[in-house]
């Protein structure tokens, strides 16, 4: 939705600029056009910077529900682990992790878990000045739409978008990327641990291939921030899955899925 709005804004600017140029002579038009196109690109980059860059964990978990995979008790990061996260880095990463766990509990209608993860997220969000996003009205919206997955995905995705946008607009881009990274890892962990033999789940291969695209994009997004120790440390932790994904094509064997699962388990154990 935000990307659609961004495109609409940019197009309206183009039309506006075109109208202004119609009354200028050719030389002035050319100079004005160059300046305006440069301004459009600047606006476009600013808009894109504030838009959640990957499919959200809610969208990923929805894929699992569509594969008719049952809810697995005990695979989410326990909400009580929040007491372990006292650094800015660990809190940001696990805000993303808990966002994925909230999506998992919500889309499988596990109400007590939804409450637990909302509480954990609210605690971290308060520390990061985002209490207005993960508030009582959000929980009420989730509760009122428990039986409508598409609406739940939209509600959660909006919350994640607002989180990313808030951080980006407040010069916390590195923290925003840690949140996105934590959510990606946990989404992958939930995906690969929905069964003792995930490779036997029909359709799981397609989900994991789609996540390779997200992973590659995520690495590209982190490149400008690799001088930040928090980003470089997190990206270094992703090395196991980077190595596995580097050798894959457009289809996965059972062994590929086992390798992905093992790599994600290693990474996840480091961040939670």
Short names for language-model regions:
Residues 24-26:
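Bacterial signal peptide processing site
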Residues 1-10:
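Bacterial N-terminal signal peptides that target proteins for export
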């Amino acid at each position: 939705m935000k990307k659609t709005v961004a495109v609409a804004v940019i197009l309206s600017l183009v039309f506006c600029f075109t109208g202004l140029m119609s009354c200028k002579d050719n030389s002035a038009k050319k100079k004005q056009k160059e300046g305006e196109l440069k301004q459009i690109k600047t606006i476009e980059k600013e808009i894109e910077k504030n838009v959640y860059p990957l499919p959200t964990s809610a969208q990923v978990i929805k894929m699992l529900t569509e594969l008719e995979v049952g809810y697995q008790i005990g695979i989410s990061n326990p909400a009580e682990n929040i007491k372990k996260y006292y650094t800015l880095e660990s809190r940001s990463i696990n805000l993303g992790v808990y966002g994925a766990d909230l999506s998992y509990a919500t889309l499988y209608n596990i109400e007590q878990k939804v409450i637990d993860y909302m509480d954990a997220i609210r605690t971290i969000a308060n520390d990061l000045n985002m209490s207005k996003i993960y508030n009582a009205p959000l929980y009420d919206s989730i509760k009122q739409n428990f039986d409508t997955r598409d609406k739940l995905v939209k509600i959660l995705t909006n919350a994640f978008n607002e989180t990313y946008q808030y951080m980006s607009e407040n010069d916390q881009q590195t923290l925003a990327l840690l949140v996105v990274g934590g959510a990606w890892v946990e989404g992958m962990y939930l995906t690969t641990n929905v069964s003792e033999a995930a490779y036997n789940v029909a359709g799981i291969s397609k989900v994991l291939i789609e996540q390779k695209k997200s992973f590659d994009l995520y690495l590209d997004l982190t490149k400008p921030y690799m001088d930040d120790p928090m980003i470089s440390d997190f990206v270094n932790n992703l090395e196991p899955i980077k190595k596995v994904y580097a050798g894959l094509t457009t289809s996965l064997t059972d062994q590929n899925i086992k390798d992905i699962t093992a790599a994600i388990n290693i990474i996840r154990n480091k961040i939670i």
